């Protein structure tokens, strides 16, 4: 698995409940741009329209070598390739419990297919974010103390 991009902001802003791997329907120039890691996953989300899942808000820059006539929209919606059962299950859960679906990681799998890891998420409140920052700082401090203790 070759990681292309990661949505670090999603781990901070949301509580991740469940993850799933999905394929992407891309143009050839977009795949070439992905190989050069010209992608930004910040502020993306998945919307289910008429029984199909679409990824919005992902910015894939076009290449410099592309002809001026053919310049695709860099922020266009991209279709996600999922099984119907998975899609319907997540659609029901998201609408019932007021959850969102966001993309976490974009990568190439062993067969060199572009895949995205999507997650069913619940938004964190401000005090939850503060709590996670405190835990992160505490863990960092503990690791530093352990390292110092065993080192000398």
UniProtKB/Swiss-Prot annotation:
It is found in: Cytoplasm. Pfam families: SmpB (PF01668). Gene3D superfamilies: 2.40.280.10. Transmembrane segments: none annotated. GO terms for biological process: trans-translation. The keyword Membrane does not apply. HAMAP family: SmpB. Required for rescue of stalled ribosomes mediated by trans-translation. Binds to transfer-messenger RNA (tmRNA), required for stable association of tmRNA with ribosomes. tmRNA and SmpB together mimic tRNA shape, replacing the anticodon stem-loop with SmpB. tmRNA is encoded by the ssrA gene; the 2 termini fold to resemble tRNA(Ala) and it encodes a 'tag peptide', a short internal open reading frame. During trans-translation Ala-aminoacylated tmRNA acts like a tRNA, entering the A-site of stalled ribosomes, displacing the stalled mRNA. Belongs to the SmpB family. This is SsrA-binding protein. It comes from Helicobacter pylori (strain J99 / ATCC 700824) (Campylobacter pylori J99).
